[in-house]
């Protein structure tokens, strides 16, 4: 909505009606109340005077994207994450599909990291996960400047919609079935391994895990790496400062030396914000970085 180069023509949601959609857009427990105007008119969602067609199809193959001129579809259900499943959107007239999650077979791209590898022949691509979008630029800057021999990643991750407010059945992930509001819950994540897909030279060099914590938004990536080229923490800070100002990574990587906490980043547009005062170094080749 804020990008003048993007024209949102339609949205599909089979689970809520139009009036409820207006309510959910207007009020948000994390980001607060929407400051603009949102309403309905003639069966459409109207945001700041812009009418948006609303579909309510469970099967993406039945969504008539072509009738509203939608060329690019963001597949963000978390269900249709393979090329075969996401390609169903193409049947309705869409030209390209971007999966907002990791995919087992779709080409994966992270802004600032490997967009140069994009081939227009691709009709379905993955934009990876939120964690990978934070970790991959972090790893790229370090690897390009100092080289990564190996590393371990931990993400301290905010609550997600799949978690439970009270203990409940979760046969495939017993710990994931525990109440979110009073637990730190160990979990798996494929984010570190996914970095190997967008930075092939790091394939097999990184792995990681997650802790789900009772916060609503903003997560942390804690990356511990052994460097190929000895350096100092000051040189690492300089590398990230320069990256945040470069034409390649400006707006994707940000840099801060302030004594910030997680809520200070609510609504931040950067994918990866390097916390210069958050990291530590054991020696000139072994370092923990925070973003």
Curated annotation (Swiss-Prot):
Coiled-coil boundaries: none
The UniProt entry lists the main location of this chain as: cytoplasm
Which SUPFAM superfamilies does this UniProt record tie to the protein? Glyceraldehyde-3-phosphate dehydrogenase-like, C-terminal domain, NAD(P)-binding Rossmann-fold domains
User: EC no.?
Assistant: 1.2.1.12
Name the pathway it acts in: Carbohydrate degradation; glycolysis; pyruvate from D-glyceraldehyde 3-phosphate: step 1/5
The answer on whether this UniProt entry bears the keyword RNA-binding reads: no
The site annotation (Activates thiol group during catalysis) covers: 157
The record's listing under InterPro entries reads: GlycerAld/Erythrose_P_DH, GlycerAld_3-P_DH_AS, GlycerAld_3-P_DH_cat, GlycerAld_3-P_DH_NAD(P)-bd, Glyceraldehyde-3-P_DH_1, NAD(P)-bd_dom_sf
Location in the cell: Cytoplasm
> What reaction does this enzyme carry out catalytically?
D-glyceraldehyde 3-phosphate + phosphate + NAD(+) = (2R)-3-phospho-glyceroyl phosphate + NADH + H(+)
Could you tell me the superkingdom of the organism this chain comes from?
Eukaryota
Gene Ontology BP terms: glucose metabolic process; glycolytic process
Q: List, in alphabetical order, the Gene Ontology terms for molecular function in this entry.
A: glyceraldehyde-3-phosphate dehydrogenase (NAD+) (phosphorylating) activity; NAD binding; NADP binding
Quaternary data: Homotetramer.
Q: Which family does it belong to?
A: Belongs to the glyceraldehyde-3-phosphate dehydrogenase family.
Q: Which NCBIfam families match?
A: GAPDH-I (TIGR01534)
- From the Swiss-Prot or TrEMBL record, give the protein name: Glyceraldehyde-3-phosphate dehydrogenase
Q: Which gene encodes it?
A: GPD
């Amino acid at each position: 909505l804020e990008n003048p180069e993007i024209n949102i023509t339609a949205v599909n949601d089979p689970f809520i009606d139009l009036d409820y959609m207006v309510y959910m857009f207007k009020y948000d427990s994390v980001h607060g109340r929407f400051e603009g105007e949102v309403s309905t008119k003639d069966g459409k969602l109207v945001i700041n005077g812009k009418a948006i067609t609303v579909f309510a199809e469970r099967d993406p193959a039945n969504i008539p994207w072509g009738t509203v001129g939608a060329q690019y579809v963001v597949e963000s259900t978390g269900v249709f994450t393979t090329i075969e499943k996401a390609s169903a959107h193409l049947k309705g007239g869409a030209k390209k599909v971007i999966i907002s999650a990791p995919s087992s077979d779709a080409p994966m791209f992270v802004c600032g990291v490997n967009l140069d590898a994009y081939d227009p022949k691709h009709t379905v691509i993955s934009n990876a996960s939120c964690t990978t979008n934070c970790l991959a630029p972090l790893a790229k800057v370090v690897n390009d400047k100092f080289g990564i021999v190996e590393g371990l990643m931990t993400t301290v991750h905010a609550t997600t919609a799949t978690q439970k407010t009270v203990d409940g059945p979760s046969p495939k992930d017993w710990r994931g079935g525990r109440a979110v509001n009073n637990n730190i819950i160990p979990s798996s994540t494929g984010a570190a391994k996914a970095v190997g897909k967008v930075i092939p030279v790091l394939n097999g060099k990184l792995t990681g895990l997650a802790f789900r914590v009772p916060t609503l938004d903003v997560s942390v990536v804690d990356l511990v790496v052994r460097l190929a080229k000895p350096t100092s923490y000051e040189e690492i800070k300089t590398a990230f400062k320069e990256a945040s100002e470069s034409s390649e990574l400006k707006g994707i990587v940000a840099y801060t030396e302030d004594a910030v906490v997680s809520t200070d980043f609510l609504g931040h547009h950067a994918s990866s914000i390097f916390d210069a005062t958050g990291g530590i170094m054991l020696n000139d080749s072994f370092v923990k970085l925070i973003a």
